């Protein structure tokens, strides 16, 4: 299990693909993990790119330290991880929570960012979104895995995907029981502080915005806010996909990323 201690935290990471290829970092969603969440992307994206998957602090196989988390702290952790791996610059991608980390990384570490890919993510938290995540926090505080599963799944996947993937979701329900609930709460509390729309005009890097058409939680209305703030960005609507577009429409998801990266110097 490869780990490195950086910025006071031990982070789990994986590297895939040619050692001399440009590096592409994938930042996970809130309760995703590097070891299992990118199963539909790893092979396709690592053919021509050095793919870096990792768990941020509080996630998966990385340390889950006590104390407050923030997107700024996650960005600092990622910068330290890249430095430890002797990676000067990278394409930075992130889905959902990982997209919020990616925004802050691009803002705070522009010299380390080759391009930016923001997927099913937000740059601000309005009251309706806050209430959804607060309902998750309520489940987490009660350490009720089944309630957390039931509260989150309808927001994370489209109805059609849920109907077609009962077995996959049953397995996922079991994994919810293994979550570190205090760490998940700290991640949610970090999310509540997201408020970067006014700074996005500072981003000069080539940017690609992707969003599932049926994403109910961080959908097109939030993606359009980001696109208005970064007018040079590409905008891609993934039709028929919910929030977890990397699982629901993996071929289109991968194709958009590869096409975007192919345009970069």
Over which residues does each language-model region extend?
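Active-site loop/oxyanion-hole signature of alpha/beta-hydrolase fold enzymes
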Residues: 39, 43, 52-93, 255
């Amino acid at each position: 299990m490869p780990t490195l201690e950086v910025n006071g935290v031990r982070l789990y990471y994986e590297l895939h693909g040619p050692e001399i290829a440009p590096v592409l970092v994938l930042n996970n969603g809130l309760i995703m993990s590097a070891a299992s969440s990118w199963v539909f992307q790893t092979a396709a994206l690592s053919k021509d790119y050095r793919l870096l998957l990792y768990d941020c602090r509080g996630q998966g196989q990385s340390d889950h330290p006590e104390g407050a988390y923030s997107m700024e702290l996650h960005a600092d952790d990622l910068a330290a991880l890249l430095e430890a791996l002797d990676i000067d610059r990278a394409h930075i991608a992130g889905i959902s929570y990982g997209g919020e980390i990616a925004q802050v990384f691009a803002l705070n570490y522009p010299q380390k960012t080759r391009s930016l890919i923001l997927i099913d993510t937000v740059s601000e938290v309005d009251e309706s979104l806050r209430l959804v995540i607060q309902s998750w926090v309520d489940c987490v505080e009660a350490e009720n895995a089944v309630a957390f599963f039931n509260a989150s799944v309808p927001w994370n996947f489209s109805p059609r995907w849920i109907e077609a993937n009962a077995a996959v979701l049953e397995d996922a329900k079991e994994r919810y029981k293994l979550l570190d609930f205090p760490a998940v709460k700290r991640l949610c509390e970090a999310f509540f502080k997201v408020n970067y729309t006014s700074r996005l005009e500072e981003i000069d890097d080539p940017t690609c915005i992707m969003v599932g058409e049926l994403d109910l939680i961080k959908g097109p209305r939030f993606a359009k806010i980001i696109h208005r703030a970064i007018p040079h960005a590409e905008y891609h609507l993934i039709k028929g996909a919910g929030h977890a577009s990397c699982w629901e429409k993996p071929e289109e998801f991968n194709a958009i990323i590869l096409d975007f990266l192919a345009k970069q110097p």
